[in-house]
């Protein structure tokens, strides 16, 4: 019997994993300069957390969650997203009492959704996201958007489009809800069963329908921006003003609602405009969620965040032809000829590694030519050849692989010599 990875998952092999590490390093450095501290939450949570936090009418909750009962009869779910989990941790650990607000958090880890597999979308996928909880200042909205843009631009992407919208406050959404009901209700039988279920629970979700997106009523649906209260309109204007100050280009799309129920006020997506990217262009999505903390059992504290898929980021890099610098960083490859030389190679390998020098040696007792080819394939900066002569002289032949220059260096001076050259 042969085994393969489960449908919708993938193995990330050497050669690819270095690209992941490079992207992750870029992300961690950006979080450092923006001061978003990492939080690590469980990969499974109580199922009710997502039903309450993400929204019972969303596709995520109704169709895409991996839910199971543990041996104690508790319903648990592999996290389909991480905002709800981070907010749960924020409430549970009373982070709202921290002296410095807002609390700025970042996360990076696997999420799970039962989705149809397609390019850049998996049932287990890695998501990076940030949450800024504790401020309703439009400037923090702009900061969160700027951070997301920085991730893509620092990775080397250029073909990007930022789309923003405002979902307004509760009064805005209540008025808009009434208008949507009047618009869709007479013709709701023409829509899919999901939309029919959403009509009374959350008609805004109809605008996010993937089945009936081309229905004529979708194009004539009342835009939420037409119902913004004076306060909501002023807030959105400030967000746009801060983005202008930061030199960030954006497009306002009044139909952008996102697929999760907790959003209000600012919502945004970053898309790839690369010609080879494919049909699904969204790379990142986020927005403000001023009622979520209270919904999950905490105080009335505002928040904003986003999440992006690492898989889709890598796909966008490929579409634009961007090559990440993933050099192996191998400092030394030791070539040993004979058992005595191999004993010395083992000793030197350990010594070099202890001094922070990335070192490799041969473990197949191959001929010198084969070992030299391995050193070249691995991108070694230096090779050290050990044989009978070198052992007798207590000195090694050190070759700089790029220039071809070769020097004889005493064993006792090898660490100093290599450290100075690296």
Curated annotation (Swiss-Prot):
Catalytic activity annotation: tRNA(His) + L-histidine + ATP = L-histidyl-tRNA(His) + AMP + diphosphate + H(+)
Source organism, top-level taxon: Bacteria
Record keywords: Aminoacyl-tRNA synthetase, ATP-binding, Cytoplasm, Ligase, Nucleotide-binding, Protein biosynthesis
One cellular component (GO) term of this entry: cytoplasm
GO function terms (MF aspect): ATP binding; catalytic activity, acting on a protein; histidine-tRNA ligase activity; transferase activity
Cited InterPro entries: aa-tRNA-synth_II (IPR006195), aa-tRNA-synth_II/BPL/LPL (IPR045864), Anticodon-bd (IPR004154), Anticodon-bd_dom_sf (IPR036621), His-tRNA-ligase (IPR015807), HisRS-like_core (IPR041715), HisRS/HisZ (IPR004516), HisRS_anticodon (IPR033656)
Compartments (UniProt record): Cytoplasm
BP GO annotations: histidyl-tRNA aminoacylation
Top enzyme class: ligase
EC number per UniProt: 6.1.1.21
Keyword Magnesium: no
Binding partners and assembly: Homodimer.
Membership in a protein family: Belongs to the class-II aminoacyl-tRNA synthetase family.
HAMAP family: His_tRNA_synth
NCBIfam families: hisS
Name of the protein in its database record: Histidine--tRNA ligase
């Amino acid at each position: 019997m042969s085994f393969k990875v489960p449908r919708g998952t993938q193995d990330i092999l050497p050669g690819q994993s270095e690209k992941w590490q490079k992207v992750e390093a870029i992300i961690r450095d950006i979080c450092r300069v923006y001061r978003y501290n990492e939080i690590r939450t469980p990969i499974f949570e109580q199922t009710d957390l997502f039903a309450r936090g993400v929204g019972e009418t969303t596709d995520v909750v109704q169709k895409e969650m991996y839910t199971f009962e543990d041996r104690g009869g508790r319903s648990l779910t592999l996290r389909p997203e991480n905002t709800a989990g981070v907010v749960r941790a924020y409430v549970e650990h009373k982070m709202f009492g921290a002296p410095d607000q807002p609390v700025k958090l970042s996360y990076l880890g696997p999420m799970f959704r039962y989705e149809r597999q397609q390019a850049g979308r998996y049932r287990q996928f890695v998501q990076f996201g940030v949450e800024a909880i504790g401020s309703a200042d439009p400037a923090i909205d702009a900061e969160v958007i700027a951070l997301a843009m920085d991730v893509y631009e620092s990775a080397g992407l250029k073909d990007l489009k930022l789309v923003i919208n405002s979902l307004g406050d509760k009064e805005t959404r209540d008025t808009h809800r009434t208008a949507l009901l009047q618009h869709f209700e007479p013709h709701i039988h023409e829509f899919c069963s999901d939309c029919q279920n959403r009509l009374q629970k959350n008609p805004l979700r109809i605008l996010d329908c993937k089945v009936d997106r081309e229905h004529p009523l979708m194009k004539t649906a009342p835009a939420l921006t037409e119902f913004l209260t004076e306060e909501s309109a002023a807030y959105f204007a400030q967000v746009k003003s801060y983005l202008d100050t930061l030199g960030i280009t954006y497009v306002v799309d009044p139909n952008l609602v996102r697929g999760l129920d907790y959003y209000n006020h600012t919502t945004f997506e970053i898309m790839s405009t690369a010609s080879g990217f494919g049909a699904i262009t969204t790379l990142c999505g986020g927005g403000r969620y001023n009622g979520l903390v209270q919904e999950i059992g905490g105080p009335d504290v505002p928040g904003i965040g986003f999440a992006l898929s690492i898989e889709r980021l890598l796909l966008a890099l490929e579409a634009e032809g961007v090559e990440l610098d993933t050099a192996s960083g191998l400092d030394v490859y030791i070539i040993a000829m004979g058992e005595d030389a191999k004993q010395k190679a083992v000793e030197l390998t350990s010594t070099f590694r202890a001094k922070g020098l990335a070192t490799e040696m041969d473990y197949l007792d191959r001929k010198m030519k084969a070992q030299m080819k391995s050193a070249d394939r691995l991108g070694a900066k230096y090779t050290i050849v050990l044989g009978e002569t070198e052992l007798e002289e207590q000195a090694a032949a050190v070759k700089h692989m790029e220039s071809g220059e070769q020097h004889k260096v005493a064993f006792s001076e090898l660490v100093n010599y290599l450290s100075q050259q690296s």
